[in-house]
Amino acid sequence: MKKLRDMGENRRIPTESSIDRILGGGVERRTITQFYGPPGSGKTNITIKLAVETARRGKNTVFIDTEGGLSVERIRQVSGDIFDRVADSIIVFEPSSFTEQGEALQRTFSFLKTHGDSTDLVVLDSAVALYRLKEGNASSFNLDLGRQMFLLLQMARRFDLAAVITNQIYSITGDDGREYVSPVGGTLLRYWSKVMVELEMGERPGERFAVLRRHRNRLEGSRVGFRIVADGIL
């Protein structure tokens, strides 16, 4: 039981970039935020920046790295003179199969039972990279993925933390003959992700955009440009 006043506290984790403008100050707690886009669009850089800002505030991050994209050197660049603090605050899981991904989430839940007060962020980068059809059919995958997302949301709510997932994209052809981008996982991941941000590559070198595709109380369709720089994102 809790007071409504406490549930309304605006305690977000900032990216310290222009992306915060469309998110209302940063990534929300007690929900799942999904960043999706093509390779190189900035998904992992955003999660690294969130982990650094979490450490700057004296809290831990659990980082489930399914693609091998978590670079110690990149974290060192973004962290600057607080690298040692950041390195001590990030707990990393590196699953090599979709089954191990589920086990990593279970172990994260067990970790939070004793470290929930000191942990503010759980990252799953990315949510579906490890799935292969040979591991099972689509219906069993959806069932397993739904269970994983349910567990992740339970962690966010029970321990008052932010849960962030990244996702890949694929192109679909609409009835009008035009190509559209859609995140992998379709309606299932959309159901669990109450905040969704699409990352786009611009036409000019280094140009990127973030578009708010789903949010409970922010203007959907809001779009900002951002850049990946040596010490993070702007």
Curated annotation (Swiss-Prot):
According to its UniProt entry, the protein's GO biological process terms are: DNA recombination; DNA repair
Q: Which Pfam families match?
A: Rad51
Keyword Nucleotide-binding among record annotations: yes
Gene3D superfamilies xrefs: P-loop containing nucleotide triphosphate hydrolases
For this protein, the record's SMART domains field holds: AAA
Q: Which UniProt keywords apply?
A: ATP-binding, DNA damage, DNA recombination, DNA-binding, Nucleotide-binding
Q: Which family does it belong to?
A: Belongs to the eukaryotic RecA-like protein family. RadB subfamily.
Protein's name according to its UniProt entry:
DNA repair and recombination protein RadB
Its gene name is radB
